[in-house]
UniProtKB/Swiss-Prot annotation:
The lineage of its organism: Eukaryota, Fungi, Dikarya, Ascomycota, Pezizomycotina. This is Protein stu1. The gene is stu1. Signal peptide: none annotated. Belongs to the CLASP family. Its main location: cytoplasm. PANTHER family: CLASP, CLIP-ASSOCIATING PROTEIN. Keywords: Cell cycle, Cell division, Cytoplasm, Cytoskeleton, Microtubule, Mitosis, Nucleus, Repeat. Interacts with microtubules.
Length: 1344
């Protein structure tokens, strides 16, 4: 019968669907049978297995019932003399019981120790090996402590009981230190120097108990072992003194009582006899302490040793404590956790003396933390309760003149009690009393009396250091009150609160709530609180440095990183300085995350951080002007030379501004200037000015991180122009010319670039550009530069997006040009001019070329050009420039349709179409052509497009062509035609100009992405009469219009919505749903792409086929640019039968998929951003899908894999992510589910678990969920689906560290439920997840 019950019990315990109460009832039923009946041998294995399952349970009721059943079961088997079965079956329980010895609950640890005690009767060697050979030498401090207590209890309890002669002999061997115990003496003595204070004190007490009656030989062996392990002196003296006094227990118990009464009560009685004498209260309170010192010196036989700097909870004078306890005869506490932090003075509460007879403390204690506190010892929990009960009335109500002194005395009494034995020997009563008085204690802490508040804070510190994790339940209310205290205005109280919070964090158990408090303090508006929080965070990192998982798994690492970033960029320098030390502590624990923070700092902050004394790599980094400061850290630059140079530049500028204006002769005619160009070029070359980018708001130097203050009177210096070029030059004042010349020589601002007139000749343009860039490249970093702050918001926006210093080119670099056969001149690499490459000059600034200086634009004066035939009124220059800009002026966009000379130029012609909003591409001067070639520079994500005031044409290869160089360009234009810099470019319908004026050009402004083909001959420009007009509408005020970023393919009429910055955390990168703003941007990209038109040559099927072959080859070699992809899209849309066979389609599609899943490369593309290039790749793939779904269906799995892999390169707010999601939806609707699921699983299973790879995992799980959702919606079950593989993957992601992955995994499991026949099969497919995961899935399945 019992065999059947045992089998049913095992089945019930293994059934995860059965409730805990039912399992406990089954176990109790079997335990009742064990207590009443003999156990058959056939039922023994089943009962042992059921007990193992019960003890391993996480439910306290079930594990407790298991321990209880084990105790009765072992006794029954020993009564039946089945020792061999016990020894055999208990081997499966040993590892579990050793683990339970280190449990955080004391009750579980005690039950595990008792189980080992019961098993010891049947298998002593195995039990001792588990307890003393494994737990005692392990890493768990609780297990060590419990194993020593078990050893002491076994040695004492069984000698009293005397169950059998065998047991008595065995224990006598242990007590006499025979062979059974001698092998564990070394491990026991090693625990005397353990890192945990509780283990040290327990080891000391255990050694004393075991060696009390030992032989001299055993004591000598003990001394030798302690010397070998270098045990601290205080422990050695206390142990030796205790085992020496333990020879006659009866004497030690009878003698010291009278001595104790004489020694303890004598000072009190003398104080009472002197009570009638009128003395000060302070004298009365201090007399008992002096008598106690005299009494102590007469009782103690050894001098007090100075305390060693050990851990917070370690004892300081254990010798005096142990000797006094034996002398007074107080019963030794049964707990081993005696960690009294006592000083040479103490008092003992007698059993009969009331609380009122205690020596009164000093009314004005010192506020120092290192003051000496007289430890107060109690002998029962009843006395602890009485002490707290007597204190309760003093803390009621508000603080007054009557109760504050009593509160002060009570708090000091609590400190003495905390330093005594109450927290260890009578911990429940002590902690319960603290909870009742906690409200009153914080009334003292928050008192306006500084002394009272100080002793309250010291009490909290003592409690934290003494009790440690035992006050975890009170930490929340303590942190709230102490942080409030730290934010107060009183410096002493705030400092005390800071020290108290630090002690609390250091000693209690770490929880996420503590980190939330610290993180909140880091972001508080109170500067003092943020300053303290930096130290708290450092303490927290140091405390948890060996337990990083407790911070990482709870989301605390992100919270900590956010706090560090916040304080490193704090407005207060003190907070920044305090957080630098904390940062390097953070760096030692999480170096990779710290490097990310360091790399995102500005140069000045990074330099100060690297120079901090706490930097562990400070000895490795030498001060350099440039280059990386150390391996693994971000590159840093020295700003010392830059600061001095900046000061010199400011002084020189001020001196020039205060200098009197000198008259200068009018500029010479153009012919004269050309003849004397060599002479005049020497002066600007010797100056320290540098020509820089026209958008003057750009941050061009890292000399100072502070904003540059604009001059008191902003000036716009004029460019020096020939007198023959401007009929109104006489109106310009002499003072203006003088200030212009001085500004050119000193500040080097872009608007003050001095150059001579540019003529159509090659030499003039080249010499002008090189003359302004005569300084070497190496001297640019430390050269002072003046930042001209513009009034428009466009400049301010642009300022925040460039932070790198701009080095200048020497003369020899100015002659560089792009080779004639470089990729820039290939079929699919025609570079359009971006809006950012045009000038933002003032209305009075002369017309100029746009020239690139190492990736930045400079203004070079151009000769007067005549574009319009409409004459200008004589007083037109005196009018407001905005009146001219208000007139809608058409802009001519030309497309060359003449036959080309080669296939090379044919495709180039076809690629020149009108597009808008291209990514910025500045220009660069070269010497062999008047056309300014393009050199690709790095792009910012939010660049601001600008307009130009120069009247040159921007060509298809990024060039500027003077209007005077064009044939028949004799029309005049208004000087201030494009004076309004904030006017956006709007797209108007195409129109054809008058054929009678083929060369009449209305403007030189080019829309980005609208190239004009220029022949290789430098004097030949082929421009067709067909034009596209873009008008400039009038705006009321240019100050309120900010030109924001427009991505490629986006129409000019953009939505006026704030740009959402890319988030750095993975939590924001949820795959579905994509935010509406990103979807809106993607729709605009697709709509703009549909407007792409093709040239007549591309309409020829034969030519189109040739272009397609060349395009495929360029995609494979990764030399295709944005315009090439648009050309391919136009060809595919126009020719329905462009793919004559499936092989050509497959070749094209595979090349596109390979390009899509490759990493974006900034350096590879000469045109546009990598994001824009990948957008065109994705649009081409979508077009291939729409063009022929039958051909595409064979590559559904390959395409989905490429989409999932490509997802990891983009943030969630990139518009291309919306395109990836929509393309995946289209493929899901077309594909076969079984093959696609395997392909997606193959991709995401191999991904690494870092932040970038999680993007692919998120999208992959989302794709799988949508596939199953589609099948469930159609109510069809596909037998070929890899359900087992899906279930295994979903179950593994239910416990992932990323919450978004867990959320999507739950959705996948819910959809998977609809594909499985029944519940049992469903849980089998998921691998029988844990109970909490099962409950969560059940909830969502039922909710569905």
């Amino acid at each position: 019968m019992m065999e059947v019950k045992a089998a049913e019990l095992v089945a019930a315990l293994k059934n995860s669907n059965m409730s805990v109460d039912t399992k406990v009832a089954h176990l109790q039923c079997v335990k009742s049978d064990i207590k009443q009946k003999n156990v058959p041998e056939g039922a023994v294995p089943s009962i042992f297995e059921s007990i193992r399952l019960a003890i391993a349970s996480q439910h306290s009721s079930l594990s407790g019932a298991g321990f209880s059943t084990l105790g009765h079961f072992l006794k029954r088997l020993l009564i039946q003399e089945l020792h061999h079965l016990v020894a055999l079956q208990c081997r499966a329980l040993y590892p579990l019981l050793v683990e339970r010895l280190g449990d955080h609950k004391e009750r579980i640890r005690a039950q595990a120790a008792q189980s080992f005690t019961d098993m010891w009767l049947a298998a002593p060697e195995e039990v001792e090996q588990c307890v003393l050979g494994q737990a005692l030498v392990g890493k768990n401090p609780r297990a060590k402590e419990m194993s020593m207590i078990w050893l002491s209890n076994v040695s004492s309890s069984f000698n009293i009981g005397g169950f059998s002669s065998f047991l008595t002999i065995a224990l006598q061997m242990t007590k006499n230190y025979g062979l059974l115990f001698r092998s564990y003496v070394s491990s026991l003595v090693a625990c005397l120097e353990d890192a945990d204070s509780n283990v040290r004190n327990t080891a000391k007490n255990t050694v004393i108990e075991l060696f009390e009656n030992a032989s001299e030989r055993a004591k000598s062996d003990l001394k030798r072992q302690m010397a070998t392990h270098n045990v601290r002196k205080s422990f050695v003296n206390a142990i030796l003194a205790s085992i020496d006094h333990g020879t006659s227990d009866m004497d030690a118990a009878s003698r010291p009582i009278s001595r104790a009464e004489a020694l303890v009560h004598r000072p009190v009685s003398r104080a009472e006899t002197q009570a009638s004498r009128s003395v000060s209260r302070l004298d009365t309170h201090q007399r008992p302490a002096s008598r106690m010192e005299l009494a102590q010196s007469s009782v103690l036989h050894t001098e007090a040793l100075p305390p060693r700097p050990v851990s917070v909870l370690s004892s300081r004078s254990e010798t005096h404590k142990e000797v006094t306890k034996e002398v007074i005869g107080v019963e030794r506490p049964k707990s081993r956790l005696t960690t009294a932090k006592s000083e040479p003075n103490w008092a003992v509460v007698s059993h009969t003396g009331p609380a009122e007879e205690l020596p009164l403390p000093s009314s004005r204690p010192a506020s120092q933390e290192g003051e000496k506190i007289d430890a107060l010892y109690v002998s029962s929990s009843r006395q602890v309760d009485e002490l707290f009960r007597d204190m309760m009335p003093h803390f009621e109500g508000r603080e007054s003149e009557d109760n504050w002194i009593r509160r002060e005395k009570d708090v000091l009494t609590l400190r003495r009690l905390t330093h005594g034995n109450a927290p260890d020997d009578y911990s429940p009563a002590y902690l319960a009393g603290l909870k009742t008085l906690l409200d009153g204690i914080f009334k003292v802490v928050n008192s306006l009396r500084t002394t009272l508040s100080t002793i309250g804070c010291l009490l909290i510190q003592d409690i934290a250091k003494r009790c440690g994790p035992r006050i975890d339940s009170m930490v929340e209310i303590m942190m709230q009150n102490l942080i409030k205290l730290c934010s107060g205005m009183k410096k002493i109280s705030a400092q005390n609160g800071n020290a108290t919070v630090d002690a609390l964090i250091e000693n209690v158990t770490f929880t996420t709530r503590i980190l939330q408090h610290v993180s909140g303090a880091c972001q508080d508006k109170n500067v003092q609180l943020r300053l303290f929080a930096a130290g708290w965070l450092k303490t927290l990192i140091q405390k948890q440095s060996h337990h990083k998982s407790s911070i990482e798994h709870g989301g605390g690492l992100d919270m900590m990183e956010k706090s560090v970033k916040k304080c490193l960029a704090d407005a207060n320098p003190g907070v920044r300085e305090a957080m630098r030390s904390t940062f390097w502590t953070y760096y030692r624990v999480w170096p990779n995350r710290a490097n990310e923070i360091l790399s995102n700092l500005d140069p000045k902050s990074r330099s100060l951080l690297e120079k901090d004394p706490a930097n562990p790599n400070a000895h490795q980094s030498a001060p350099k002007d440039s280059g990386p400061s150390r391996k693994g850290l971000a590159n840093g630059t020295s700003s010392l030379a830059g600061r001095s140079a900046l000061k010199e530049a400011i002084a020189a500028q001020k001196k020039a501004r205060l200098a009197p204006a000198k008259a200068v002769p009018p500029p010479r005619p153009e012919s004269a200037q050309s003849a004397l160009s060599d002479k005049h070029s020497s002066a600007p070359s010797s100056s320290k000015s540098s020509v820089r980018t026209v958008p003057t708001g750009t941050s061009l130097s890292s000399l100072s991180s502070a904003p540059v203050r604009p001059a008191a009177k902003p000036r716009r210096p004029e460019l020096n122009r020939p007198a023959t070029a401007d009929p109104y030059a006489a109106r310009r004042s002499v003072a203006t010319d003088s200030s212009t010349r001085h500004g050119n020589q000193i500040d080097g601002s872009p608007s003050a670039a001095k150059s001579k007139s540019s003529t159509p000749s090659l030499k003039s343009v080249s010499s002008t550009g090189s003359r302004d860039r005569a300084d070497p490249v190496g001297t640019t970093r430390d050269r002072p530069k003046r930042l001209v702050i513009s009034k428009t918001r466009s400049h301010d926006t642009h300022t925040r997006q460039h932070s790198k210093p701009i080095p200048t080119h020497s003369r020899k670099n100015s002659n560089e040009s792009i080779p004639r056969h470089s990729p820039l001149r290939s079929e699919f690499s025609v570079t359009p001019i971006s809006p950012n490459s045009v000038s933002l000059e003032t209305p009075s600034t002369p017309r100029s070329h746009l020239v690139q200086d190492h990736g930045n634009l400079i203004a070079i004066a151009s000769p007067p050009t005549h574009i319009q035939r409409t004459p200008i009124e004589p007083d037109a220059s005196a009018e407001d420039p905005r009146e001219h800009a208000a007139k809608a002026t058409p802009v001519a966009i030309f497309e060359d349709t003449t036959p080309a000379r080669s296939d090379h130029d044919d495709i180039q012609d076809a690629a020149m179409t009108l597009t808008e909003n291209q990514t910025p591409q500045p220009s660069k001067v070269h010497s062999d052509s008047p056309i300014v070639s393009n050199k690709r520079v790095s792009n910012q994500d939010e660049s601001v497009p600008h307009l130009t005031t120069g009247l040159g044409f921007l060509t298809g290869v990024g060039s500027v062509v003077e209007a005077s160089e064009l044939p028949n360009s004799d029309a005049q234009t208004d000087q201030s035609l494009f004076a309004d810099h904030s006017l956006p470019v709007t797209h108007q319908p195409d129109s054809v100009t008058d054929s009678s004026k083929p060369s009449g050009l209305s403007s030189s402004l080019m829309v980005a992405g609208s190239p004009i083909r220029v022949a290789n001959n430098e004097n030949e420009i082929v421009i067709d009469s067909k034009t596209t007009h873009v008008s400039l509408p009038h705006r009321s005020s240019p100050k309120h219009n900010v030109l924001g970023e427009l991505t490629s393919n986006e129409p000019s009429q953009r939505a006026n919505k704030q740009i959402r910055h890319a988030a750095n955390k993975l939590e924001d990168e949820v795959t579905t749903p994509i935010d509406d703003h990103s979807r809106h941007r993607w729709k605009k990209v697709e709509i703009a792409d549909r407007r792409t038109s093709i040239s007549p040559r591309s309409k020829d099927p034969t030519k189109a086929q040739q272009m397609l072959d060349k395009g495929i080859q360029r995609i494979r070699t990764k030399t295709m640019d944005i315009l090439g992809y648009r050309k391919l899209q136009g060809i595919i849309k126009y020719h329905d039968s462009i793919f004559t066979n499936e092989e050509k389609y497959d070749e094209m599609l595979l090349a596109l998929l390979d390009e899509l899943e490759s990493s974006p490369d900034d350096k590879r593309q000469p045109l546009g951003r990598p994001l824009d290039l990948k957008t065109q790749v994705l649009l081409t793939i979508r077009l291939m899908l729409i063009h022929n779904k039958i051909y595409f269906s064979a590559y559904c799995s390959r395409a989905l894999g490429a989409l999932v892999l490509a997802r990891k390169y983009y943030d969630a707010n990139c518009h291309i992510v919306s395109g990836l999601e929509e393309t995946a939806d289209d493929i899901i609707a077309l594909c076969e589910p079984a093959a696609v699921i395997d392909s997606v699983l193959d991709v995401i299973i191999t991904e690494e678990k870092d932040d970038r790879e999680y993007r692919s995992i998120l999208m992959g799980v989302s794709v799988l969920t949508r596939i199953l959702s589609r099948l469930n919606a159609d109510k069809c079950r596909v037998p070929e689906l890899p359900l087992d593989r899906l279930g295994q993957f979903a179950a593994s992601k239910l416990a992932d560290r990323q919450p978004d992955v867990r959320r999507l995994a739950v959705q996948l499991c819910v959809q998977l439920h609809g594909m499985v026949a029944n519940e049992e099969e469903y849980w089998r497919v998921l691998g029988h997840p844990r109970e909490n995961s099962r409950n969560l899935l059940t909830y969502y399945i039922l909710k569905k």
